[in-house]
Amino acid sequence: GNMVPNKLYLNKGNMIFEDISDAAGVAGDHRWYTGTTMIDINNDGLLDIYVSVSGKFAPRTNQLFINNGDLTFTESAANYGLDAEEEIIQTTFFDYDQDGDLDAFLANYPSTSFRTPNVKYQFLKYAKDLEKSDRLLEQQADGTFKDVTEAAGILNFGLAISASIADFNNDGLEDIYVSNDFSTPDFLYLNNGDGTFTDKIKESTNQTAFYGMGTDAADINNDGLIDLMQVDMAAQDNRRQKANMASMNPELFWSTVNAGFHHQYMYNTLQLNRGTVNGTPIFSNIAFAAGVASTDWSWCPLFADFDNDGYKDLFISNGTRKEVNNRDYFKQVDKISGQEQLDQSLALSLEMPEEPIDNYIFKNNGNTTFSKANEDWSLSYVGFSNGAAYGDLDNDGDLDLVIN
């Protein structure tokens, strides 16, 4: 939770859950907690909990709760070298070097301003500052983690909101797709098999999302190739599009391209994997053709076979409590300057527009197109949603959804 206690719910069966957060010792101390990963970090057969921490205020150290086997946990991040202090959004564990243990990729979102010019992003990209880069940690033989970010070739500035791990070029090695916010380009790190990675985002894709949000990787057409969904913030209806689409500004778009970044558009991308050329995966963005290009202020895309027909369907959570991209709001703020703007900052923030919206769930039609299925599947909720996860919570053979 963000500056509120974390929650751990014990599944008692029959869709009944018990809050054991305090008794288990995982409630935390009101840090700005972001992503949570459950992983058996010490190979004892028990699930541990790794919680990423962001925000502007200390303490900002990630926490690792080791499972004691009796429904209690002991915080041990420092003992494992996992006490990162950057502004980490989410951590993903995977075996990038194929040595039989799990390593960690930490998606970092360093502090920035939404009005930061592209020339500063360009400068930061080449500054090679570890505190402003995603991080790669290699697990050592003794179970501790060592930072190998620079040695692996991924010391780059970015505003990461998510990272998806998959073998995108079918060479048996796990690669990394990093979704970055604002003008900072995404990264597609291909695993070279020697402990290093090479960014191939421009070679592999024609364009990406502008406000890169959540991602998920899956084979949507059962051709044996891993595809990728990346969500952005484009609304379906014309009114909300015009009110909230910053990238409708041509000057902003071309300043991004001319700064050496990628072609980025404020729409979702569904990257269909068409195979490889000399080891580089080639993607075609089919989001519009597939019917999934605009899902409003989206956060978490999840591919899963919700109707058990053999094809991966798509769930997308969306919503924002305050619409900080609203063009009309910005015009109002720009009329006020200097000390007056500072004095009225709280009042202005409270006046930001807000509009609850529905999540999206799409049925995979089996032909690389999707159909919205909210009503057919009785999954409509008008509100403000962020994270989501799926699993068979009642052991009935189908997938259930938890939405924050």
Regions found by a protein language model. Give the residues of each.
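Acidic, glycine/proline-rich Ca2+-coordinating loop motifs
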Residues: G1-N404
